[in-house]
């Protein structure tokens, strides 16, 4: 598949571009680069910014790994592919800002190919992006979802609603009965209508991520905050850790396939905390997060209704 090289080139360019733009807006730290090889096949390049003015930690990882047999996390939904050799490539990133008023964000775009001698390769794309605020701002939520909607629109009216719901369903902590954040887009097993269109869609998602995120960073990075906001941010980061270690398929695939643990766990926040039976004060900004932002909402429909009324 000659198209695989084009995907790899795009992913490497995406990683470079995102790192350059994040370092520019941070202004206090740059990305350290760590190239690595995987004994079972393949390798990657992890880039991590730590201790910045804006970002406490930002990790942007590229990997292209190969293996002789699909791990259980990848073949559970496709038992017909069990035992096939595979290659997987992608860019995955998580950004943990210092300010509690800037949301944590995550994005991922990837290509997976399962191969068997004498048969056509089975391929699919996956990915998306999602936002995890600690303090909710409706303006930010609407902008985030408007960006997601607009990049999906050229691919069909049904794409944004479908992948928005998939994101709401996926980034949900079942053991807490609580969403991780306000969602965005999530998709997997994308192979229709063809390779070129699917590839065009992941380019739109990858390139659209910073269009959604950087304006929010700019709006919130200079807001003053104190110990109360920081403590709540660290408490909510605990939910991020719980999701990644218990529910996230990407984390499980990486660990089960003998992936590089340092790169897989790059998504973890540098600091987090847990508190027994924490309850936010009624009517507080912290309570508002649970009340108005974590329950799944159609942000764009509400925004359009409000604009018509105005």
From Swiss-Prot:
Which key words tag this protein in UniProt? Cytoplasm, Heme biosynthesis, Metal-binding, Oxidoreductase, Porphyrin biosynthesis
Gene Ontology annotations of biological process type: protoporphyrinogen IX biosynthetic process
- Residue ranges, annotated region (Important for dimerization): 240-275
GO MF term set: coproporphyrinogen oxidase activity; metal ion binding; protein homodimerization activity
**Active-site residues per Swiss-Prot or TrEMBL entry:** 106 (proton donor)
The EC number(s) given in the record are: 1.3.3.3
Q: So which domain of life are we looking at?
A: Bacteria
Cite the NCBIfam families for this sequence. PRK05330.1
Q: What is this protein called?
A: Oxygen-dependent coproporphyrinogen-III oxidase
Taxonomic lineage of this organism? Bacteria, Pseudomonadati, Pseudomonadota, Gammaproteobacteria, Enterobacterales
* Gene name linked to the record: hemF
């Amino acid at each position: 598949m000659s198209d695989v090289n084009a995907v790899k080139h795009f992913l490497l360019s995406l990683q470079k571009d995102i790192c350059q733009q994040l370092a520019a807006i941070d202004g206090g730290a740059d990305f350290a680069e760590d190239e690595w090889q995987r004994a079972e096949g393949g390798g990657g390049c992890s880039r991590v910014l730590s201790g910045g003015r804006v970002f406490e930690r930002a990790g942007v990882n590229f990997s292209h790994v190969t293996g002789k047999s699909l791990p259980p996390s990848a073949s559970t939904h496709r038992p017909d592919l069990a035992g096939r050799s595979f290659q997987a490539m992608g860019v995955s990133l998580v950004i943990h800002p210092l300010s509690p008023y800037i949301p944590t964000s995550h994005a991922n775009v990837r290509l997976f190919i399962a191969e068997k001698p004498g048969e056509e390769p089975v391929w699919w794309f996956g990915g998306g992006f999602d936002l995890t605020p600690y303090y909710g701002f409706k303006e930010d939520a609407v902008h985030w979802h408007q960006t997601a909607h607009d990049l999906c629109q050229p691919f069909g009216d049904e794409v944004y609603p479908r992948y928005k719901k998939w994101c709401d369903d996926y980034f949900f902590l079942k053991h807490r009965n609580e969403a991780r954040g306000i969602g965005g887009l999530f998709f997997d097993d994308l192979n229709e209508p063809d390779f070129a269109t699917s590839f065009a869609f992941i380019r739109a998602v990858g390139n659209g991520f910073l269009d959604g995120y950087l304006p929010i960073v700019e709006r919130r990075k200079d807001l003053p905050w104190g110990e109360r906001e920081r403590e709540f941010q660290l408490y909510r980061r605990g939910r991020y850790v719980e999701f990644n270690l218990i529910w996230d398929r990407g984390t499980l695939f990486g660990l089960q396939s003998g992936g590089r643990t340092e790169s897989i766990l790059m998504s973890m926040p540098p600091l987090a905390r847990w508190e027994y039976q924490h309850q936010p004060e009624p009517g507080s900004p912290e309570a508002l997060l649970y009340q108005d932002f974590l329950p799944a909402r159609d942000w764009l429909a509400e925004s359009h209704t409000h604009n018509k009324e105005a």
